[in-house]
Amino acid sequence: MIQIHALPAFNDNYIWLLQDLSSQQCVVVDPGDAAPVLEWLAQNPHCRLTDILITHHHNDHVGGVVELKQATRARVLGPAAESIPARDVALADHDRLTVLGLEFVVHAVPGHTLGHIAFYHEDAAAPLLFSGDTLFAAGCGRLFEGTPGQMHASLERLAALPDSTLIYCAHEYTLSNLRFAQAVEPDNQDIAERLAQVTLMRSENRISLPSSLALEKRTNPFLRTRETSVKEKADERSGGQNTSQSAVFASLRAWKDKF
């Protein structure tokens, strides 16, 4: 049985730790800081860290890799197209890897960074997606390296996964993302309900993740660029007609950057 733990780091990062209760092995995703992982391992001394999965090269995702590898000898797997410290296995689009007995498929999702990847585990009951800084709950990552067209294509690719997919992103941005989503679609009842729920959760210091792809399709404006209400708001913001979904996305992203 696999349990997934969220280890908070910095102001709003989550390091995801997957624990196999039967084998007493574990894996972490995007350890920007070694300390929370080492603390968890100290509290669970019978569990051995076997693998470190990396989605992209930003320091808040890789800052703890070297220390963790030195402490545990864990294998480091990360995108081939980026410089990842202490990487043992370079991963490219469509590659398959197995950790804790779970097979993951690598999806190249450029936009936030050019070499960004996501890890997808296909499962009839509960598919899993570790999306890094590409797809957030109710939002998406900033475009530090890629183009709006690249990010839109990456999000469309992830949106094609099963609706039941559970989404484990790397930051607690849900509340601010939902406030933006409500500005885009003020009449969207699903957004209003989710905003109320997450406001309560965060007031009680509860995590708002994981999300699901079905929920994102109802409440995430960056996955709703084909909706008339979203396009109309994007056109209003950009002062003209956005003639493609990619252009709608670009308008929304530029707005969100200043929101």
Swiss-Prot record:
Binds 2 Zn(2+) ions per subunit. Zn(2+) 2 binds at residues 60-61, 133, 171. Its EC number is 3.1.2.6. GO terms for molecular function: hydroxyacylglutathione hydrolase activity; metal ion binding. InterPro entries: Clx_II_MBL, Glyoxalase_II_hydrolase, HAGH_C, Hydroxyacylglutathione_Hdrlase, Metallo-B-lactamas, RibonucZ/Hydroxyglut_hydro. It catalyses: an S-(2-hydroxyacyl)glutathione + H2O = a 2-hydroxy carboxylate + glutathione + H(+). This is Hydroxyacylglutathione hydrolase. The lineage of its organism: Bacteria, Pseudomonadati, Pseudomonadota, Gammaproteobacteria, Pseudomonadales. The gene is gloB.
